[in-house]
Swiss-Prot record:
Record note on quaternary structure: Homodimer.
Residues in CR-type zinc fingers: 137-215
PANTHER family: DNAJ HOMOLOG 1, MITOCHONDRIAL-RELATED (PTHR43096:SF52)
InterPro entries for the chain: DnaJ, DnaJ_C, DnaJ_domain, DnaJ_domain_CS, HSP40/DnaJ_pept-bd, HSP_DnaJ_Cys-rich_dom, HSP_DnaJ_Cys-rich_dom_sf, J_dom_sf
Source superkingdom: Bacteria
Stated name of the protein: Chaperone protein DnaJ
Domain named J: residues: 5-69
Summary of the function given for this chain in its UniProt record: Participates actively in the response to hyperosmotic and heat shock by preventing the aggregation of stress-denatured proteins and by disaggregating proteins, also in an autonomous, DnaK-independent fashion. Unfolded proteins bind initially to DnaJ; upon interaction with the DnaJ-bound protein, DnaK hydrolyzes its bound ATP, resulting in the formation of a stable complex. GrpE releases ADP from DnaK; ATP binding to DnaK triggers the release of the substrate protein, thus completing the reaction cycle.
Cofactor(s) required, per the database record: Zn(2+)
Family annotation (Pfam families): DnaJ (PF00226), DnaJ_C (PF01556), DnaJ_CXXCXGXG (PF00684)
Lineage of origin: Bacteria, Pseudomonadati, Pseudomonadota, Alphaproteobacteria, Rickettsiales
Length: 374
């Protein structure tokens, strides 16, 4: 096998990428590792595979190998004391760990000690406000139950003055390993429950957790222009972490109550405006309530029809992080009086006589009827 060059040993082309080299190496290493096969020449082939990969995975060595050729590179390595792999065997667990990670989507646990600190959970709070509060923005006080950092042990979980020791069963790793053939199975350490350390004297107030539950009060700022369904994040205001871990976040979900007058359409507001049939016919000026409080004057054009829409610009909702406002759209609702005085009836009868095109049997009346459907 060693009569072949390193590319041939790994079964790849000279233009192979590092990913292709690693893939080929892992496949051959799995096949020829002495721990996985009883083949007579397995150890020899395994050494050759490692020798080839050791050179080709290093860009500088690979460049020299390509420039000098196999024999010249070997001679230079021998003179320089390189290229001697002796009886070195990479750990089969490392090979299989890489193999499963690359080809089966697995992951490998680091052998370094893990921290016992655990981040706290995020919390969600549903807050209902009215439309005026959404327009102006408001500071709201909310109350909720949450895990908070223990003020006795300051989150360590240990009694004051007591030290936290590394677990001797797992050496601080948090897991123990069990050999099954040539596979290694990891499981959470039974002694420290995967924490990697032992608290000999747990804090009495928090029972070693570094936190405890209590009712919290928090002031939250709701910005002007917030919309229904907006989620506001308050970093670090969620549950306290376990044994000094970082706190989670608090998410406040905003719901806006329906308004008695206005209907919301994005940043625009819609409202129905009752006007008399006299104002609709003659035109006029009326006062309209606006969301910020107070009233503004609205001019009604003569001949306004029921359902006509008039726009008040920049009188809608405010927008978050913007000075621009939406509009208010008023929908005319022409009111016809039900109870007329004698004088009102006389005037209307006179108006009726003076009206033109009022005959209900002429063509213009039926044309008007048809136009209402268009």
């Amino acid at each position: 096998m060693m009569s072949q060059n390193y590319y041939q040993i790994l079964g790849v082309s000279k233009t192979a990428s590092q990913a292709d080299l690693k893939k080929a190496y892992l496949k051959l290493a799995k096949q020829y590792h002495p721990d996985t096969t009883d083949a007579k020449d397995a150890e020899k082939k395994f050494k050759e595979i490692n020798a080839a990969y050791d050179v080709l995975k290093d860009e500088q060595k690979r460049a020299a190998y390509d420039r000098l050729g196999h024999d010249a590179f070997q001679n230079q390595q021998s003179r320089g004391g390189g290229g001697n792999h002796g009886g070195f065997h990479p750990d089969i667990n490392d090979i299989f760990g890489d193999f499963f990670s690359d080809f089966m989507g697995g992951s490998r646990r680091s052998s370094r000690p893990t921290s016992a600190k655990v981040r706290g959970s995020d919390l969600k709070y549903n807050l209902t406000i009215n439309l005026e509060e959404a327009f102006h923005g408001i500071e709201k006080n909310i109350s909720f139950s949450s895990a908070v950092k223990c003020d006795t042990c300051h989150g360590s979980g240990s009694e004051k003055g007591e030290t936290v020791t590394t677990c001797d069963a797992c050496s601080g790793v948090g897991v123990t390993r069990m050999q099954q053939g040539f596979f290694t199975i990891e499981q959470a350490c039974h002694k420290c429950q995967g924490n990697g350390h032992i608290i000999k004297k747990p804090c009495k107030k928090c029972h070693g957790m570094g936190r405890y539950h209590k009712q919290r009060n928090l002031s939250v700022n709701i910005p002007a222009g917030v919309e229904n369904g907006t989620r506001i994040r308050h970093t670090g205001e969620g549950e306290a972490g376990i044994r000094g871990g970082n706190s989670g976040d608090l998410y406040v979900d905003i719901a806006i109550k329906p308004h008695d007058i206005y209907k919301v359409d994005g940043a625009h507001l819609h409202c129905k405006l009752p006007i008399s049939f006299v104002n609709a016919a003659l035109g006029g000026e009326i006062e309209v309530p606006v969301i910020e409080g107070g009233k503004v004057k609205l001019t009604i054009p003569a001949g306004t029809q029921n359902g006509d829409q008039l726009r008040l610009r920049n009188k809608g909702m405010s927008k978050m992080r913007s000075t621009i406002r939406g509009d208010m759209l008023t929908h005319m609702h022409v009111e016809v009086p039900k109870n007329l005085s004698k004088r009102q009836r006389e005037l209307l009868e006179e108006f009726k006589k003076e009206s033109i095109n009022e005959k209900e049997n002429d063509g213009s009346f039926f044309n008007k009827m048809k136009s209402l459907w268009s």
